[in-house]
Amino acid sequence: MMNITRRDAIRSMVTGTMLFPAIVQDLLGAQTANPLAPRAPHFPGKAKRLIFLYMTGGVSHVDTFDPKPGLVKAVNEGKKPQGNFKSYLPGAWEFSPSKATGAEVSSLFPHVSGILDEVALIRSMVAAHNDHFQASQGLHNGSVTVKRPSMGSWVSYGLGTENQNLPSFVVIAPYLPYAGAINWTSDFLPGAHTGTRIAGGAEPVADLNRRTPTAELQQLELGLLDRLNNQHLISRPGDNALAARIKSFEIAYGMQSEMPEVLDLSKETDATLKLYGLERGDNQGFAWQCLIGRRLAERGVRYIELVDSGTTKNWDSHNEIDEMNAMAKNADQSIAALVKDLKSRGMLEDTLVVWATEFGRTPWLEQTHGRGHYNKCFSCWMAGGGIKPGIVYGKTDELGLNVAENPVTVHDFQATILHCLGFDHTKLTFRHAGRDFRLTDVHGNVVNALLA
């Protein structure tokens, strides 16, 4: 068929030439392979999907999941941290043993404390960078130096989706986290594996509703646009941005039929809304994100990331550590509710839930009454599909300065997540620029002690 420009196509539609039947015939012809078709992993993974709870900004380990009474002793004895820092800063919240496992958790997370029997708590995480942008990129993309495909994109590439009317990778983020959309880029992977962002509010998904007078006219318009776009792509092989744009039209069309139902909470019971801390009509906030995350998981979305930014602020507590009160209150109940809800529906056994942050905070005072960035040790946790519940793994020293036992690097963390989903992280690769790339690069070991 001859090359057709967009101008030609529009002119032909207006003047009623014989162009359109030929396009329809082509559209009914051979179909290209679907990059989001369901695919089998390397081995049967215990998890079929992942919900990634991302606490952007850097959560203080010594104020949440890693109690350090040694900080009080250090202050009383007049010990000073190295460098030009004034003093150590003891945790401001009381720690008490979880009724579920006995592991100590601070009063910031009373609800999460109640689900620790489902959780593998890691107290020995180590990140490769001390800056938000690079550390966020490292946690999500496996590299602190250059942009690479995100973990969600790798999972989408490896598993595809179980629902062709929804993206395989969805990010619910009312505000952009550090490193922005790099956290969900597909980079050199096929563009269909880029994360789709939901923001919340009155229009959670931008431009979701059709603007054409009828659905039939929209189908004709999209069919023509798809034909022209694919002709354009043939002349530009390897243009990943164009391929992503083309696939976005297909996904957007499918989302028009299914996403409104996902976002409609009217059929959720009063008991479920109360569990999450929601009121009827709520359409934003982290509780809303968690419930929508569960609904996406039910409908076959493979990778769901929930970015907790609280308000326009985040967990980056340089000046006032007390800001963590509001941040934790915003997230604690809904995080615990999500785990409980998944379990009550029989979904926790094949859904991996991950709670993570890009790094921890300094055990010493910074600025007025806050803590600085600290990548030498911090805490994260996992629950659900493939994870051994009710354990604490790793240990830091008495002041929370360094890992004392069983360090877990970000690449180890990623390798373990991929293992739960059925992947050998060394074999989930993509050929680009003359070599095979993978999420963990040349690093990473599965932490077998975390596995069920």
Please give the residue ranges for each predicted region.
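Ligand-binding pockets and gating/stacking loops
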Residues: 1-452
